Amino acid sequence: MWKAVMNAWNGTESQSKNVSNIQSYSFEDMKRIVGKHDPNVVLVDVREPSEYSIVHIPASINVPYRSHPDAFALDPLEFEKQIGIPKPDSAKELIFYCASGKRGGEAQKVASSHGYSNTSLYPGSMNDWVSHGGDKLDL
């Protein structure tokens, strides 16, 4: 039981699961997703640009939650003006992550409440990605 609690806390569950209707992914799931290069999936790193510039999951976009908590409530033109990239299509799956899962979960809720019906979370986020060597993979 304690191991399951620690795995949940650290985001290192060995399989994906759906909690409270929010799909969440493990490191192995994320590795497969990144390797597929699916144009219908958008990886959303919600850390600040200074964190993102150090290390991030390949092909992810940076939408910083702390400095832009309501970014997904913005219209597309204002989103692009403030964030510097086009606003993701609401028909795509958005997978949110941050450093440890907290900001990613918060940003996922904001996006869900503003018309994004296919949102997911990588709860282990960058801590899990780096601890499993994801930053060293050639994807």
UniProtKB/Swiss-Prot annotation:
List each copy of the Rhodanese domain by range. 37-138
List the molecular function annotations (GO) for this entry.
Answer: thiosulfate-cyanide sulfurtransferase activity
Where, subcellularly, is it found?
Mitochondrion
EC annotation from Swiss-Prot or TrEMBL: 2.8.1.-
Residues at the active site: C98 (cysteine persulfide intermediate)
The UniProt note on how this protein's activity is regulated states:
GSS(-) is a potent inhibitor of RDL1, since the presence of the sulfur dioxygenase strongly increases the RDL1 catalytic activity.
**Keyword terms of this UniProt record:** Mitochondrion, Phosphoprotein, Transferase
Membrane-spanning residues: none
Provide one Gene Ontology biological process annotation: sulfur compound metabolic process
Q: Other remarks?
A: Present with 7470 molecules/cell in log phase SD medium.
Q: What does this protein do?
A: Thiosulfate:glutathione sulfurtransferase (TST) required to produce S-sulfanylglutathione (GSS(-)), a central intermediate in hydrogen sulfide metabolism. Provides the link between the first step in H(2)S metabolism performed by the sulfide:quinone oxidoreductase (SQOR) which catalyzes the conversion of H(2)S to thiosulfate, and the sulfur dioxygenase (SDO) which uses GSS(-) as substrate. The thermodynamic coupling of the irreversible SDO and reversible TST reactions provides a model for the physiologically relevant reaction with thiosulfate as the sulfane donor.
Name assigned to this protein: Thiosulfate:glutathione sulfurtransferase
Q: Which organism is it from?
A: Saccharomyces cerevisiae (strain ATCC 204508 / S288c)
Q: Which gene encodes it?
A: RDL1
